Structures are given as C-alpha cells and as structure tokens.
Amino acid sequence: MIKFQSLNQSKQFLRIFKKKSLNTKYFTIYFEKNLSSVKKNDKKFLNISFVMKKNIGNAVIRNKIKRKLKSAVQKVLKEKQSVDLNYTYVIFGRNNVYKDKFQLIFDEVNDMFKRIKQIAS
C-alpha cells in the first residue's frame, strides 16, 4: 500500500508553486519531479499535500474538502494506478468540492493525474 507523505517546510511549498500547475473546477494541482524516490523499509510513499485557503468556510468545511480530495487520490491509487510516484504534488481545494458528489471529484482527480502523466512523457 502506498502511503502519503506530506510536505512540511514552507520552502518546499514555495519551490513547487513556481513549477507547473493544472486547474479544474474543484482544485488546482501543482507538481514537480522528485530528485530521488522515497522508500523506507520497502514501502512506497507519495509526496502530496492538501492545502486550503482560510477564506473558504470554517475549519469543518475545509477539513471535509481535504478528506474528500484525499480519499479520491487514494481511490485513484488503488484502482487506476495513474499516479506517478516520482512527482511531488500540492493540491489546493476549492469550495465546489464540498457541494458536489464524490464520483465527480474522483473522475476529475483521475483525469488530472492522466494529464500529468502525458505532460511528463
């Protein structure tokens, strides 16, 4: 099983924000190729962070949006395997995620990771 590893330093976020990005109705995803793959004890990690602006609802709404996006990425990892583990991702959630159904969000996340794979190759 692939585990998520979050970015934890502001300079890591700033470096990724200067790289490529893709926009959708539900989120903006920034991505950058890793210099080395992260493996600990033969476990694979995906470098990904979910970020929200403070002007979107209250903390409960922001956390629900992050949970929906995170579960959509987990489902893509399990079913489709279209996520490239050699990249670092930062996903900015938008307010539309809170209102819409999970299947729409899942389809959008899956399409975004396919587009990133096409851009990478």
List PLM regions with ranges:
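Positively charged, solvent-exposed patches that mediate nucleic-acid binding
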Residues: 1-121
